[in-house]
Amino acid sequence: MKPFAVLGLGNSLMGDDAAGVAVAEMLARDPTVTDRAEVWTAGADVLRSMDRIDGRERVILVDAVECGEEPGRVSVVDQPPLDRPHGHAHWLSAAEAVELMRRAMPGLRPAKFTWVLVHVASIKAQEGLSAEVAAAIPAAAAAVKALIP
């Protein structure tokens, strides 16, 4: 098992919600990343990846977030707020899912979760990313690469 994991979250049928998927697909083609990290798309449910997450040194979750910030902006955070309303297609936010995993499995490893968030204007049923979000995919991929020693 590689010590690092990168999960691209999102739904490709929900427009900009697929930002995390696009980043993961880009990183999965980069041997400088795949030599050190396992990269996969996790759809819209982090909990389905629980068995693949446990035992990692660090897990990086890449997701779209609709929260009023400029579309295409990339943020790196260790813990998104749990009490902030989330605008995305998931039934649980990534932060809520990780908190649920930690409570259900007190010995859950990794010790560190990090989120790379791509800010979007809206998430709605459509195929393809908006121009602003598509332009941000390389920056989000670079942010992930910077987190993998």
Place the predicted regions along the sequence by residue.
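N-terminal catalytic or cofactor-binding beta/alpha core of small enzyme domains
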Residues: 1-122, 127-138, 144-149
